[in-house]
Amino acid sequence: MEVRKINTHNREKKLDDIVYDDFISTLRQIKEGNHQLREEFISEYKPFILKVTSNATGKYIDTRNSDEFSIALSAFNEAIDKFDIEKGYNFFLFSEQVIRRRLIDYSRSNKDDKEYPFSFFDDEYFYNNEKLLSKSYIGFEDIEAREDIEELKKKLQEFGITFLDLVLNVPKHRDSRQLCIRLAKMLAEDEQMYNALMKNKNIPRNELKKKAKVHGRTIGNNRKYIIALCLIFRSNLNLSKRYLEYYTMDGESDLI
């Protein structure tokens, strides 16, 4: 039993390394001039940018009409360019610093009409090299409250799903991801189907297939991803839910 535990731990660690390597590979391609990948990367991490902006300014951010959010987006883009992959720093902690510094620059040039909490200028948010080497580099921990993440983690475990499974089972094509999000939302909003999911620990495939008018194989092939997204829709992970709502649009609208 102990050997099996160690093997499982090693496997998860190895998969973590694979995910991290993929993340770094994406950053390298962006820094080498892949503009489409850069746009997709920034779009994917808008919830993180929104969270940093909201925390920094101490207020709700309307992404459709916010100078601060526009500045934060620009700062995140700047962080991509300035990030030194070879130093092994945590990209998200690094980009958070860049965003906060640009927001501070903006606030100082607009003192007359902007008010920010004192914590906005605290040094505790500017990390030393040791903290920047942290490997909490990717996933929900970057955008949501830890207790809500732990609650989701427990529910996923009931289905034999980990956060790593979620990362590894993301459909490659945007239209496939959008379809899975719609299926997950449909499953989450239908009490009868959701109760069946929680009771049987499996998607009520026939009911969902009939309601969504999709092939059963589509549901089966994306089972883990759909279940995870459904649980997110039923959770307190509000930023993640808003992002999923945004992702089902045409990609031209902003977060709502």
UniProtKB/Swiss-Prot annotation:
A GO MF annotation of the entry reads: DNA binding
Q: Keyword Transcription, does the record have it?
A: yes
Keyword list (alphabetical) reads: Cytoplasm, DNA-binding, Sigma factor, Transcription, Transcription regulation
Enumerate the subcellular locations listed in this protein's record, separating them with semicolons.
Cytoplasm
Record motif Polymerase core binding, residues: 67-80
Record comment: activity regulation? Negatively regulated by the anti-sigma-I factor RsgI1. Binding of the polysaccharide substrate to RsgI1 may lead to the release and activation of SigI1.
Q: How does it assemble?
A: Interacts with RsgI1.
Q: What does this protein do?
A: Sigma factors are initiation factors that promote the attachment of RNA polymerase to specific initiation sites and are then released. This sigma factor is involved in regulation of cellulosomal genes via an external polysaccharide-sensing mechanism. SigI1 promotes transcription from sigI1 and celS promoters.
Protein name from the UniProt record: RNA polymerase sigma factor SigI1
Q: Which organism is it from?
A: Acetivibrio thermocellus (strain ATCC 27405 / DSM 1237 / JCM 9322 / NBRC 103400 / NCIMB 10682 / NRRL B-4536 / VPI 7372) (Clostridium thermocellum)
